[in-house]
Amino acid sequence: MNKSEFFEREILLIESEDLRDFVRFFFNERVGAWFWESGASASGKYHPKFAQGEGGLVRHTRAVAMVCEELLRMSTYAYMKSEYKDYARVACLLHDTRKYGRGDEEDKDCYKEHGAIAADDVYRAWHDFFTGGDRCPEFLTLAIKSHMGQWTEHREDRPFTNIDRVVHLADYMASRSFFDIPQIVEEYNEDRAREIVEALEDGYHIINDKVVPPLEKVFQKVWDLAPEGVEVFEPGRARWNEMEANP
């Protein structure tokens, strides 16, 4: 199961097929492991209960996307071009993808600038994905950069366009402690169960509720990364071959 499938319901609301594919690519290839495991709030003070604990940031992101859809029905935003509505949808899905860092390990130092960092990485990923295509839309990156509204680190990065405003409002409303969407928890649990079942079928292991690759995949990754001619890994390869021959 690809990680983007946790958001497939929301991705399918994006009208542009190219943008749908880009969002899937970003979640599957450019989002660190911490994103799928972390809660939406480090302190637990500023987000509803369903957005706390493992997977909380995933559930929060889905809530933001759902609120965005409701806001887009209001007259203030309903008359935006379909293209602009899609930018808002994409920004809502990707706005917190750098909240705690760029790599697989959490880096809380990124928090204050996470909107700007995410916008920059979306820009880079866009040009990796759409090779030879149009430039990444500034409307998209600005909406990601400004999603914290009045709490954005730099005044010049605060919401300006209607796209910016709808993304910020969706994030703000979905972050209120009194907010609750039971459906999100139910669907997250269903998706997580499916992920575990598919991982077990593919030979992965579940350790402490984490999906862990089989030993041969770990060894293979080490061997693939080894510089050509380096023999230090050969004892490990020989030992693995022996284990396979004598299970």
Feature annotation, model-predicted:
Residues 25-33, 40-41, 91, 143-147:
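Short acidic/histidine-centered micro-motifs embedded in hydrophobic/aromatic stretches
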Residues 1-25, 52-59, 63-86, 94, ...:
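Divalent metal-dependent phosphate-bond-processing catalytic cores, especially two-metal-ion Mg2+/Mn2+ enzymes
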Residues 29-60:
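Active-site flanking loop/helix segments enriched in acidic
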